[in-house]
Amino acid sequence: MSDENRLVAAVRTEFGKGAARRARRDGQVPAVLYGHGEDPRHLNVPSRDFAAILRAHGTNAILTLDIEGKEQVALTKSVVVHPIRNYIEHADLLVIKKGEKVTVDVPVVVTGEAAAGTLVAQDAATISLEADALHIPEQIEVSVEGLEVGTQILANQLELPKGSTLQADEELLIVNVVAAPTAADLEEETGEAAAEAEAPAEEGAES
């Protein structure tokens, strides 16, 4: 594990919303480390360093935690982000061991350009995989280069990295290539929307 994913974690001795707010004020993220039958450990990790790791490696980032001088490898299992202020409020971390398999949701990224006159609809933003805990793919790419109207890509058609297996429904729709709306279609939709908006106004005037 590279040093860039190393975090010095402090064991929490205070709990509750007030303690969590104080920790965040001090530049720390409250976190819980659990797994392998061990009692959950309540920690604080540096918010700036943790956020940088997530930006670089995604939400399934592997961490090397330094807890009171002892190292523990952990998977970032879930992260709660404030909906307005966009800071990390809390994180759940999972103890992992070398050679262990874990199930994770990995982002799906669409690449390439479909045929002219098409529109690419991405129906699934993530895909559930089982992968080696220390070799989780950051993303799964699916190419739509040159695809024609009517083409669909299902989960079982994705190219997965070696050691990863699909856990999602094999028939899960990932990408659907449809006909792009024409100028006439857009004009018709605009006209219908305007007519719908005028109807309530006319009804109100009559009453």
Curated annotation (Swiss-Prot):
Any one GO CC term of the record: cytosolic large ribosomal subunit
One Pfam family cited in the UniProt record for this chain: Ribosomal_TL5_C
InterPro entries in alphabetical order: Rbsml_bL25/Gln-tRNA_synth_N (IPR020056), Ribosomal_bL25/Gln-tRNA_synth (IPR011035), Ribosomal_bL25_b-dom (IPR020057), Ribosomal_bL25_C (IPR037121), Ribosomal_bL25_long (IPR001021), Ribosomal_L25_dom (IPR029751), Ribosomal_uL5_bac-type (IPR020930), UreE_N (IPR004029)
Record carries keyword rRNA-binding: yes
Keyword tags: Ribonucleoprotein, Ribosomal protein, RNA-binding, rRNA-binding
Coiled coil (UniProt feature): none
Gene Ontology BP annotations: translation
Example GO molecular function: 5S rRNA binding
Disulfide bonds: none
Entry-linked SUPFAM superfamilies: Ribosomal protein L25-like (SSF50715)
Domain of life, per lineage: Bacteria
Region (Disordered): 185-207
Xref: NCBIfam families: bL25_bact_ctc (TIGR00731), PRK05618.2-1 (NF004131)
Oligomer and partners: Part of the 50S ribosomal subunit; part of the 5S rRNA/L5/L18/L25 subcomplex. Contacts the 5S rRNA. Binds to the 5S rRNA independently of L5 and L18.
Record function comment: This is one of the proteins that binds to the 5S RNA in the ribosome where it forms part of the central protuberance.
PANTHER family per the UniProt record, alphabetical: RIBOSOMAL PROTEIN L25/GLN-TRNA SYNTHETASE, ANTI-CODON-BINDING DOMAIN-CONTAINING PROTEIN, RIBOSOMAL PROTEIN L25_GLN-TRNA SYNTHETASE, ANTI-CODON-BINDING DOMAIN-CONTAINING PROTEIN
Family listed: Belongs to the bacterial ribosomal protein bL25 family. CTC subfamily.
Protein name: Large ribosomal subunit protein bL25
Species whose genome carries this gene: Rhodococcus jostii (strain RHA1)
Protein's gene: rplY
